[in-house]
């Protein structure tokens, strides 16, 4: 990173963390740059910046305003893979949004060193990582002790979030512990607990919370292993299919039946489409064990 560029951004009013981010990007040479891009430069145009910034796609990506009339600063959350149903996609989108609002509202700090992020990134690529692997997470000093945070956080969260005097700031935790909490005195209460406290603080109407709860329940069940990941579900489907010969070759029949099961699973995941799915059953035939397999929530742990 160009330290002079970092200092220039700080002198312009940018905070150190954001200056680190942009200086590390702008210090690199662009992949493509034409002579026209360098002509008639002025502070009101963002074309050159977009050229430099457009080739960097981090997991969490800042999107600065493109003009005074367009949308303001935006943040893209990019690491999530596509889910099998709209309901599952909506669940992760809702959870990410509510957690982001809670972090901002309560001034929470979940920063961890980038080398630990990379180590966790390697762990999460392993098979059945949700249940079998552990990931680095900030276990201590993540909750502010300021009067501001004490006023905004509900009493249950304050009692659970007492700062530890001993122990490492960062620790290895399972996905279940990160999402649902460690379940021990003084342990991390879980990101879902923080989201619920945010909803309490915002005095979310009961009707809205009833609408949100099924989505948050999916996040809880996915982290605990009650609900399988799409990868686990697909592996289980293939292994149990009568045409799979345990030879690592997935033939067209297995793929076709899986896609039909996914469509049926999508229909069953939404109550609005449930009646349509039943009516269409005679035109969309499944073998019974495929339907049961598509709807089951449990898979073999060794898959």
Residue ranges and their predicted role:
Residues 1-302:
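C-terminal accessory/tail domains of diverse enzymes
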């Amino acid at each position: 990173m160009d330290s002079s560029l970092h200092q220039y951004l700080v002198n312009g009013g940018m905070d150190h963390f954001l200056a680190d981010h942009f200086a590390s990007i702008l210090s690199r040479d662009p992949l493509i740059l034409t002579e026209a891009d360098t002509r008639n430069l002025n502070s009101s145009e963002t074309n050159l910046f977009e050229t430099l910034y457009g080739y960097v796609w981090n997991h969490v990506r800042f999107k600065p305003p493109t003009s005074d009339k367009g949308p303001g600063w935006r943040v893209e959350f990019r690491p999530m893979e596509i889910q099998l149903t709209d309901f599952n996609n909506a669940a992760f989108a809702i959870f990410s949004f509510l957690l982001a609002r809670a972090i901002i509202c309560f001034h929470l700090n979940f920063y961890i060193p980038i080398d630990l992020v990379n180590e966790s990134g390697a762990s999460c690529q392993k098979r059945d990582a949700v249940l079998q692997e552990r990931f680095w997470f900030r276990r201590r000093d993540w909750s502010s002790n300021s009067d501001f945070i004490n006023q905004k956080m509900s009493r249950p969260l304050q009692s659970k979030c007492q700062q530890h005097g001993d122990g490492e700031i960062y620790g290895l935790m399972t996905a279940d512990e990160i999402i649902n909490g460690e379940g021990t005195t003084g342990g991390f209460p879980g990101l879902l607990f923080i989201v619920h406290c945010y909803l309490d603080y915002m005095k979310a109407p009961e009707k809205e919370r009833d609408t949100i709860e099924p989505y948050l329940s999916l996040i809880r069940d996915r982290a605990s292993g009650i609900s399988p990941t799409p990868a686990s579900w697909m592996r289980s489907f293939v292994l149990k299919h009568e045409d799979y010969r345990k030879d690592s070759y997935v033939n067209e029949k297995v793929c076709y039946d899986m896609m039909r099961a996914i469509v049926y699973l999508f229909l069953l995941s939404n109550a609005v489409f449930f009646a349509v799915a039943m009516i269409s059953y005679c035109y969309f035939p499944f073998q019974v064990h495929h339907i049961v397999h598509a709807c089951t929530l449990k898979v073999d742990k060794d898959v």
